[in-house]
């Protein structure tokens, strides 16, 4: 897709926003994958393993991440279509008649991309390390090169079709891994699995009061709420604004916000990431050899290596 985009897109609009031609279905999947990404696959179950169901309530970010898109995305698309904006810097500089804002948007985009990409690459590196035995740094660098290649050569169109595959792997992987963990012989099915969870220390099962540190660690109700509010920035980021500029029509916006993010990803997170995190905690406390030295970054890779069939 990177090479295809390189040979077919000859304008700045074609490269940066796919010529405003991203189709309905592709946007649904790719934008949802971009909203959640590798952190949800690797880090989310890892924090459930570490802090228990107190953190699992943060899965409600499937509601808060699309909220900013609900408020602003359609208006952003209309302005981009009407005035021909290609980047968010174009939009803000024109709207406020101030070129300084263009550079502020660029700085925001660079800082956002550096740290957000670093989280994803760290997750990928941890996965490579456990599954393939490749050092974490080498795995992260290898993935960074692949991303750099298809983004630089193919632009947003290449990123979109890669995002479609990423969505299938993300949601499908979470559900499949959670299912295999729950049905593993070590647990003996749903009844035995739920009984094992009930036997855990209460700090892994209860959410603290509004502000009451200790039980459940730092994940108090207020902490969970502010954490979810912080994630609202994803769909208001400069990168996501360019996704919005790139679609053919605003029709997929509501479907992405209400159905794909909230229902589809929510189904995977509320159930199957909890199965993964709590299952790993049970096995660790039971003295399972594979989970003796796991940490937040390696919980999911170890689960994959232990429970998934070889062909996966």
Question: What residue spans do the PLM features occupy?
Answer:
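Hydrophobic alpha-helical transmembrane segments
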Residues: 1-16, 51-57, 87-91, 111-117, ...
